């Protein structure tokens, strides 16, 4: 069935689904390609706006406001396609297709102990990110849910090399409740890479974590939290590199329904691992092996 015979509602669903499949750094390219097929500017603009908003949340798209990095995520969404930045105390809309902030408004925040703690933790997190990532960005967000205060740390680094036929993203988030004495940190680390020379290879690797953290005072908590993030990300990177090294031709044949064509001889695995290392920059630590890799090959 072609797009021309689909109802408008079905077209909207297909367009949005295709746009949401765009890898990090490739949303605008996917949108432009679809525009050539759809040839309905109004429909594409509306779906691009909706899908772009979701894409920003999914991949923690970084912005810069007043010289400070801002990571977009569902944790700082306000509704009506708006985001909120604690640092600048601004709310805004972001047009991913035009890479432009829109409808910027001031937005006050409550200055309480949780806010002071957020600022201290952000300073410690910035020191860690600047030391471990080539072009890393981080945010520390605060949220109140049922009268309980939560702090959310977000980290992102990417390297989009479309000219070299690959893109890579590393992101993580860490959430904990502001409690006296002891709190539980829930974390998730996510890596995605896309290679599109000769074959189309998508790699997604993620890991969920839970760790306890003692709370004595703000300074101690900030240092302990940054140390926890460093240890867990180091372990994760070491496990990722070990797992990628196991993706030899023999291992790939076992997960493929058919052998790769002759063009597989052009794949330079050493270069791929070297390129990935530019994205996954944290220093190596102890290895915790975790098998959670999804590889999709489209010949």
UniProtKB/Swiss-Prot annotation:
Describe, from its UniProt entry, the tissues in which this protein is expressed.
Expressed exclusively in testis and sperm. Highest expression is found in the neck region of ejaculated sperm with lower levels found in the tail and postacrosome region.
Presence of keyword Transferase: no
* Location(s) in or outside the cell: Cytoplasm, Cytoskeleton
* PROSITE patterns xref list: F_ACTIN_CAPPING_A_1 (PS00748), F_ACTIN_CAPPING_A_2 (PS00749)
User: What one GO molecular function would you report for this record?
Assistant: actin filament binding
A Pfam entry, by short name:
F-actin_cap_A
Question: Which cellular component terms (GO) are annotated to the entry?
Answer: cortical cytoskeleton; cytosol; F-actin capping protein complex; membrane; nucleus; sperm head
UniProt KW Phosphoprotein keyword: yes
Report the record's Gene Ontology biological process terms: actin cytoskeleton organization; actin filament organization; barbed-end actin filament capping; cytoplasm organization; spermatid development
Which domain of life does the protein's organism represent?
Eukaryota
Q: Which InterPro entries match?
A: CapZ_alpha, CapZ_alpha/beta, CapZ_alpha/beta_2, CapZ_alpha_1, F-actin_cap_asu_CS
Residues modified as Phosphoserine: 290
Query: Where is this protein primarily located?
Result: cytoplasm
Which PANTHER family does the entry mention?
F-ACTIN-CAPPING PROTEIN SUBUNIT ALPHA, F-ACTIN-CAPPING PROTEIN SUBUNIT ALPHA-3
State the protein's purpose.
Answer: F-actin-capping proteins bind in a Ca(2+)-independent manner to the fast growing ends of actin filaments (barbed end) thereby blocking the exchange of subunits at these ends. Unlike other capping proteins (such as gelsolin and severin), these proteins do not sever actin filaments. May play a role in the morphogenesis of spermatid.
Q: Tell me how this protein assembles.
A: Component of the F-actin capping complex, composed of a heterodimer of an alpha and a beta subunit. Component of the WASH complex, composed of F-actin-capping protein subunit alpha (CAPZA1, CAPZA2 or CAPZA3), F-actin-capping protein subunit beta (CAPZB), WASH (WASHC1, WASH2P, WASH3P, WASH4P, WASH5P or WASH6P), WASHC2 (WASHC2A or WASHC2C), WASHC3, WASHC4 and WASHC5.
Q: What is this protein called?
A: F-actin-capping protein subunit alpha-3
Gene encoding it?
A: CAPZA3
């Amino acid at each position: 069935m072609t797009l021309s015979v689909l109802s408008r509602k079905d077209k909207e669903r297909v367009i949005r689904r295709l746009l949401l499949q765009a890898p990090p750094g490739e949303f605008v390219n996917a949108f432009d390609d679809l525009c050539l097929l759809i040839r309905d500017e109004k429909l594409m603009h509306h779906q691009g706006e909706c899908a772009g908003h979701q894409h920003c949340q999914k991949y923690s798209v970084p912005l810069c406001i007043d010289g400070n990095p801002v990571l977009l995520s569902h944790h700082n969404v306000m509704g009506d396609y708006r985001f909120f930045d604690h640092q600048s105390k601004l709310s805004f809309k972001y047009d991913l297709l035009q890479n432009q902030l829109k409808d910027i408004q001031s937005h006050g925040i409550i200055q309480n102990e949780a806010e002071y703690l957020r600022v201290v933790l952000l300073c410690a997190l910035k020191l860690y990110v600047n030391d471990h990532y080539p072009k890393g960005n981080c945010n520390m967000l605060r949220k109140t849910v049922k009268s309980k205060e939560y702090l959310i740390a977000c980290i992102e680094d990417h390297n989009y090399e479309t000219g070299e036929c690959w893109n890579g993203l590393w992101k993580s988030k860490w959430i904990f409740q502001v409690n006296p004495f002891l709190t539980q940190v829930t974390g998730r680390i996510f890596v995605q890479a896309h290679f599109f020379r000769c074959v189309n290879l998508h790699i997604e690797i993620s890991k969920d974590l839970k760790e306890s953290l003692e709370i004595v005072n703000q300074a101690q908590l900030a240092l302990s939290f940054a140390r926890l993030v460093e240890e867990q990300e180091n372990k994760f990177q070491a496990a990722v590199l070990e797992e990628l090294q196991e993706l030899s031709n023999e291992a790939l044949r076992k997960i493929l329904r058919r052998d790769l064509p002759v063009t597989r001889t052009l794949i330079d695995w050493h270069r791929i691992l070297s390129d990935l290392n530019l994205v996954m920059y944290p220093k190596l630590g102890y290895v915790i092996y975790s098998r959670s890799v999804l590889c999709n090959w489209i010949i």
